[in-house]
């Protein structure tokens, strides 16, 4: 209320965020939304969900490249004062539905408190018991929300970072070296097909502060990798561990759960 400009929401998606954002913002006054997705990097269902989206204020664009390429360009747009000034003249301002906007992460923090309360309600734990949380992730957003929940006092022992064949986060959590100079894999869990995990920067900021994080991000941009110091890795290891799996094991897990529980889990949950 009181804002005369129109919000232009830019969304880079590896699959799931795009449809959710389009549906959430369709036909809302003073909002326009543009979603960009990798042309060959989402499932057919995800592509159709976005391409057939109804709404007078929505736009969807397939990009030749992967999610990292798109996310980097969206960040460049946000950091460009020239683009911001030009949009201002036209009556627009930029916003995002990605986790580049912390407003995306804030509601996710609630998931973990709700889950803990459910475990208490079902008498599976008692108040104060610590739990382990396993999150399939590529961009490190939802698992960072779990970490914030832990900082807020939720009794979480270990945050388990589950990766697919693009296992850059697993390598980082085990070695402290983040190296995106590697092969990019298109997998059956496309929402996790990411090599530049933008929310990891936030974790490093929480643990090591602005100056060290800025140095590491500069190295990532210039050289494609960085190595954190031993103290930082030790501190991260107090809360996180990382594991990865391949396509074969992911499919086996889907089959096992369907056979044992008559429940079809999706490919990301299977990771």
Predicted features along the sequence, with ranges:
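PLP-dependent amino-acid enzyme catalytic core
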Residues: 1-271
